[in-house]
Amino acid sequence: MGHKVNPTGIRLGVIKEHNSVWYADKKDYAKNLLNDIQVREFLDKRLVKASVSKIVIERPAQNARITIHTARPGIVIGKKGEDVDRLRREVSDMMGVPVHINIEEVRKPDLDARLVAQNVAGQLERRVMFRRAMKRAVQNAMRQGAKGIKIQVGGRLGGAEIARSEWYREGRVPLHTLRADIDYATYEAHTTYGVIGVKVWIFKGEILGGMEQVRADKKASGKKGSK
């Protein structure tokens, strides 16, 4: 059987940026990497209800900058910014350097693979039929302007004795075209029958200008957000 490469990993440096952006000496590299993983796990656990899509960690000289992309910024920030201040202190203790936390709102959660996967997994945990959950998520994404979307679920679907996987697709999802902007994510639904895995691929269009266009678009959206 053929194995598919991770759609995000194969596009790094082509049209996708890394989620950890820093340089380290050889002796510090493993320590920093482990620290990043621990911080991500801590934030994912702490902000489980905040619909967190992505966490970007940057390490400029002797401090750290963490950008949390979320569909519910209010939950992360908390009343008068209390929650985000507490979060900053805790993460700073973990990393051993001063930490600055930025919150970026995800304006279209139906077009974010991780949030779609979380949503489908949440429905499966609430015992919604898996086909209905997949179909609803696919229709919402296509309505929001996705060029194509594929959702796959695998496990003891509907409480069946034998585990299997099923998928639903609409539109185009070109995994081999490197200039294709494919957003990919996985998530787990913990049901009474066991764990059901959810995979989501969303095709948002082609990026013809490579990394230069990605950075230009990012800069433009940043200016728009600051206005």
Curated annotation (Swiss-Prot):
Keywords: Ribonucleoprotein, Ribosomal protein, RNA-binding, rRNA-binding. InterPro entries: KH_dom (IPR004087), KH_dom-like_a/b (IPR015946), KH_dom_type_2 (IPR004044), KH_sf_prok-type (IPR009019), Ribosomal_S3_C_sf (IPR036419), Ribosomal_uS3_bac-typ (IPR005704), Ribosomal_uS3_C (IPR001351), Ribosomal_uS3_CS (IPR018280). Gene3D superfamilies: 3.30.300.20, Ribosomal protein S3, C-terminal domain. GO terms for molecular function: mRNA binding; rRNA binding; structural constituent of ribosome. GO terms for biological process: translation. Residues 39-107 form the KH type-2 domain. GO terms for cellular component: cytosolic small ribosomal subunit. Pfam families: KH_2, Ribosomal_S3_C. Belongs to the universal ribosomal protein uS3 family. Binds the lower part of the 30S subunit head. Binds mRNA in the 70S ribosome, positioning it for translation. Part of the 30S ribosomal subunit. Forms a tight complex with proteins S10 and S14. This is Small ribosomal subunit protein uS3. The gene is rpsC.
